[in-house]
A protein has these predicted regions:
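Short, solvent-exposed loop/turn segments enriched in Ser/Thr/Gly
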Residues: 1-3, 68
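Asparagine-centered strand-capping/turn motif at beta-strand->loop junctions
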Residues: 6-12, 75
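Short acidic, flexible loop segments centered on an aromatic residue
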Residues: 12-33
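Residue-level recognition of conserved beta-strand positions in structured domain cores
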Residues: 19, 35-36, 56, 69, ...
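Extended, polar beta-sheet/loop recognition surfaces of beta-rich domains
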Residues: 21, 39-42, 82, 87-88
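Short, surface-exposed linear segments at secondary-structure transitions and domain or protein termini
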Residues: 26-29, 41-51, 91-98
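Intrinsically disordered, low-complexity Pro/Gly/Ser/Thr-rich segments with frequent PxxP/GP/PP motifs
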Residues: 32-64
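Terminal connector regions
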Residues: 59-98
Length: 98
């Protein structure tokens, strides 16, 4: 499955993506957890009003699944980390629904 995530910085601060955390759920396995630095090899710095997109993918063995997680960001002004939640989204094999 491929997915596209868009982040828009609507704050007045410069932020940077530093880590990712994903929960990948499918019907045939326990939830898989993936964590690591950056996203697709990038630790993007996002200025006020700027938008970035990440395209990636995951392999699951079932026809349907779901993902949720968060990106850990850092505020460049305060050096404080915060989590940017990514709500659950479905992974559906459209061909199996026909």
């Amino acid at each position: 499955f491929r997915y596209l995530i868009t982040i828009e910085n609507q704050s007045n601060e410069i932020i940077q993506l530093v880590k990712r955390h994903w929960n990948i759920m499918e019907s045939t396995k326990p939830t898989q957890i993936f964590e690591g630095p950056g996203v697709v090899g990038k630790k993007s710095i996002i200025k006020t009003g700027q938008m970035v997109q990440y395209e990636s993918g995951c392999i699951i063995n079932s026809q349907r699944g779901a993902m949720k997680g968060f990106y850990t960001m850092i505020n460049h002004s305060t050096a404080k980390e915060f989590n940017l939640e990514i709500p659950v989204f479905q992974l559906d094999n459209l061909f199996s629904l026909n």
